[in-house]
Amino acid sequence: MSDNQDILAVIALTLPDGSVKTFPIGTTGNDVALSIGRKLAQDALALRVNGVAIDLSTPLTADAAIEIITFSSPAGQDIFWHSSSHLMAQAIEELYPGSKFGAGPSIEQGFYYDVASTHRFREEDLRKIEERMLEISKRDIQIRREEMSRTDAIEFFKTVRNDPYKVEILEDTLKEVERVSLYHQDGFTDLCIGPHIPSTSKVKAVLLSNISSSYWRGDSARENMQRIYGITFPSEKLLKEHVARLEEAKRRDHRKLGAELELFMLSPEVGSGLPIWLPKGAIIRNELETFLKEEQRKRGYLPVYTPHIGNIELYKRSGHYPYYSDSQFPPLTYHDEEGKQEQYLLKPMNCPHHHLIYSSKMRSYRDLPLRLTEFGTVYRHEQSGELNGLVRARGFTQDDSHIYCRPDQLVDEICSAIELTQFVFGTLGFSEVQTRLSMHDPENQAKYGGTAEVWEQAEKDVQEAADRMGIDYFIGVGEASFYGPKIDFIVRDALGRKWQLGTVQVDYVMPERFDLTYTGSDGQKHRPVVIHRAPFGSMERFIGVLIEHTAGNFPLWLAPVQAVVLPIAEDVLDYAKSVHQALLAAGIRAELDTRSEKIGKKIRDAEVSKIPCMIVIGQKEQESGEVSLRRHRIGDEGRFSVSGLIEKLKTEITGKS
């Protein structure tokens, strides 16, 4: 072989640390991992080449920047769990022949697969499937990718697999695609873009958690399916850690704590997904609303109120109907005295109503920005299987604001909305916040309102504002709303779970649909830009997340009961009552425990109720005109005069510490 041929047969691969290694053409990711170390090769799941993840078995033919993907990274977990959904499907097919499979994606914590089967799955079946998955894992089946034309794939899934769901995907969703990829593991084959783990043996621990109902393609008019959820790990140790987190999550479950702390209730007599706020929960919600209203007032927002229903024509004009019709309650049909028919919808969004408020009078460039705000209740007909206490409800209240501004004011207003959202999260103890710039998918322009040029400008403005605010963000292509790009704020709670809460969204589309205008300095009409903004997102969801984040241990300013007065004996009851009244008069939410229980029992009950301050009063306190302060989860803090205690607590409450 000549020197030139030797040079051509070598490729240079740049590793994450910047070092460069040369390998023969045709080297695979597995070869690279082995060259670095046996442990890395054991942990390797896939390879990232120039930013794109591929299978470890794929030959490399050109110079590239590469990275070995392991389970320790989000990308590795995504690949591992999606591969595990195929493993579960293979196990189900072996145990329950004739089962067919719909969608089987990875999710944030594991995976699921929608299964069409004559067998009605029960809890005990999950254990059988787990056992079979581990048995398949021990077979060490090499997972093999095959590419073929879409036409050949349709024939394969019709004749070999007899899988109508994959045929439908190929004939419908992928109709513009020429070639597709399949993944084989023994006798099981599935349609998938990949990549996948190299072998079933990578899966060492399995937990299938629950079964719910679903519909093919999420359409209630289509076939009913059974959705099986699970999670897998490359070691038993990781599974045990996961189970421990699940136990802690159960302890923090907002539905459990909501009942124990008497915050909210759900009743079948009212309807699924329609929470009722009890007095203590209403206090928390009111405190949060008051907090945000005060901050908005400082920033020039104007409050409005709008109805809970609206004429369907309003939502047709905005595009919310029929765009969101699958998640809306059916229209209410009304006939007036003359027989004329009108249809109304339970309000799916507040924004169309706010746009009408804007257009109710002529606006000048001097009037802008106009910032309208409302805690408006909206309604979505979520599927019953998706409902989850407060965090996924059918009726919920959004802290909705719409800012109408001139184009030259836009970036400043986005920055102001970002600052307010950051302030809200910081005040409420969410220190880990990710920011996603949710952009449109240019390959699917028909999904969005407005022109490509409008979207280009909107996304440029969003990114400029994020850069100006120094936000560390990532871009989510295809995550935008149909009328504009968004800045989504994703908080991480005390258990490490991620929740998408607040949002700031730019909208050039609705001003066109509602013909919103203002008179410029040139005397001509111009279009304003709209910013949709909601730091909480929805009050129900935010409070549900907050309950779990704090485990019900709310900060003093937010606690429904801020202090409880605990007299040690009946002979100090009159003094305890006077202390209680002094606290109430100072605006502190306080209770008085007059039960004839021992002080230890009263303290334990107050701890269980998660009351921040316990004010203990005995003979010594009465004689000195003082009180003893005990903090929830902390213990004794010493004795104070009544006025000194009140001043101390009010300072903490005002400072929201």
UniProtKB/Swiss-Prot annotation:
State how the cofactor is bound.
Answer: Binds 1 zinc ion per subunit.
Task: Give the top-rank taxon of the lineage listed in the UniProt record for this protein.
Answer: Bacteria
Q: Where is the TGS domain?
A: 7-70
Gene Ontology CC: cytoplasm
InterPro entries (UniProt xref)? aa-tRNA-synt_IIb (IPR002314), aa-tRNA-synth_II (IPR006195), aa-tRNA-synth_II/BPL/LPL (IPR045864), Anticodon-bd (IPR004154), Anticodon-bd_dom_sf (IPR036621), Beta-grasp_dom_sf (IPR012675), TGS (IPR004095), TGS-like (IPR012676)
Work out whether the entry's keyword set contains RNA-binding: yes
Task: Classify the main location.
Answer: cytoplasm
* Keyword terms, alphabetized: Aminoacyl-tRNA synthetase, ATP-binding, Cytoplasm, Ligase, Metal-binding, Nucleotide-binding, Protein biosynthesis, RNA-binding, tRNA-binding, Zinc
What does the subunit section of this Swiss-Prot or TrEMBL entry state? Homodimer.
This one is known as: Threonine--tRNA ligase
Provenance organism = Pelodictyon phaeoclathratiforme (strain DSM 5477 / BU-1)
